[in-house]
A protein has these predicted regions:
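Redox-cofactor binding/interface segments in oxidoreductases and associated redox assembly factors
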Residues: 8, 148-149, 266
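FAD/FMN-dependent oxidoreductases across multiple families
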Residues: 120, 217-292, 301
Length: 354
């Protein structure tokens, strides 16, 4: 069977694209490798921007996907200056694996789903041949269009486009934890071990500590920062339940955003659509997926799709580039210290509270 569109990846970008493109009656195949043994490493917080995007589709999050506690503020810690401030934020704390499964369940049955890992994509005449490893067998599918929704490690982007965008290694550990005395969500800065940020998040009976680290010496710096943090907060981080890691993009320039051409297109983080300041990518994944699905639904001409998709995602690129400048205030120690020292935009903790 030859498909009109093959989607690689069934996260928020891929599932949204599949759901929207299915309205066009095209022949669609979506391929994803995530399962209970191969989960996507993620902090699992749904930011307000992403919540707003789901509201446009009248999508609600079932309580089974949410975990305890729900979050209304973030405790911001600078390990060098020892300054701590609190800022109001509204995140949904959730199980990321169940969240992705729920989004896949919303895809109409008319879309074929294959659980497997894409190993190769090649152009052959007027079609793309997509090789998929499923149950230790290589199966080849053909399609007129390939959409890469496979995140930072995108095989689609690596195969067809230059992948020079800056990357971090996101590393996080899970710990068994029944002590809820510390804040439920903390954001950590430590310029000596990372040029980015780290986080502490409670999820039911677990505590997650993770961060985005420069690729060079990432494991060493993770361990150094972890030791520094545990001593500062007097927090026991020795009872490790599991450790996970994945690459994450940090866009810096317009050229880091690659939307695609000639029947091979990228959405979500695979296209570079992720916040360089907070690394929130779900809202951009949904936006880019919706834009491309609407364009392909009405057009089969590669040139028209390429031109319109590039033009209609310009607003998204500008928004993310603005966050490059926001990052300067967040990650420049001098500017951040001024903001935190004077309590700009922070909320005051009541006396006697930990």
């Amino acid at each position: 069977m030859i498909y009109d569109v093959i989607i690689i990846g069934a996260g928020p970008a891929g599932s949204t694209f599949a759901r929207e493109i299915s309205k066009s009656k095209k022949k669609i195949l979506i391929i994803d490798n995530q399962n209970i043994k191969n989960k996507k490493p993620c902090g699992g917080l749904l930011a307000p921007d992403a919540q707003k995007e789901f509201a446009h589709y009248d999508i609600v999050i079932p309580k089974e996907i949410l975990v305890s506690p729900q979050i209304f503020s973030v405790k911001t810690i600078d390990l060098n200056t020892k300054i701590i401030k609190y800022y109001q934020r509204y995140y949904l704390n959730m199980d990321r694996y169940l969240f992705d499964k729920y989004l896949v369940s919303l895809i109409p049955k008319s879309v074929n789903y294959v659980c497997g890992r894409c190993t190769q994509i090649v152009k052959e005449n007027n079609y793309y041949k997509v090789s998929v490893n499923t149950d230790n067998k290589i199966i080849i599918y053909k399609s007129k269009i390939v959409v890469g929704a496979d995140g930072c490690s995108s095989i689609v982007r690596r195969t067809f486009y230059k992948d020079k965008i800056m990357k971090y290694m996101a590393i996080q550990e899970w710990y068994k934890c029944e002590d809820k005395s510390n804040s439920f969500y903390s954001c950590i800065f430590d310029k000596k071990t990372s040029s980015s940020c780290s986080w502490l998040i409670h999820k039911d009976d677990y505590l997650i500590y993770g961060g985005a680290f420069d690729l060079l010496n990432c494991n060493k710096n993770f361990a150094l920062q972890k030791d520094k943090l545990s001593k500062f907060l007097k927090l026991d981080l020795s009872n490790i339940y599991k450790k996970e890691a994945c690459l994450v993009y940090r866009p810096r320039y317009f050229c880091d955003f690659v939307t695609g051409k000639n029947g091979v297109y990228l959405i979500g983080e695979a296209a570079g659509f992720i916040s360089p300041s907070s690394f929130e990518g779900i809202s951009s994944a949904i936006k880019s997926a919706d834009v491309l699905a609407n364009i392909i639904s009405k057009n089969d001409n590669y040139k028209i799709v390429t031109r319109r998709y590039k033009r209609k995602t310009l607003f998204l690129k500008i928004k993310l580039i603005i966050k490059v400048f926001k990052r300067i205030f967040m990650y420049n120690e001098f500017l951040r210290n001024i903001i935190m020292k004077f309590g700009i935009l922070s909320i005051k903790k009541k006396k006697g509270e930990k």
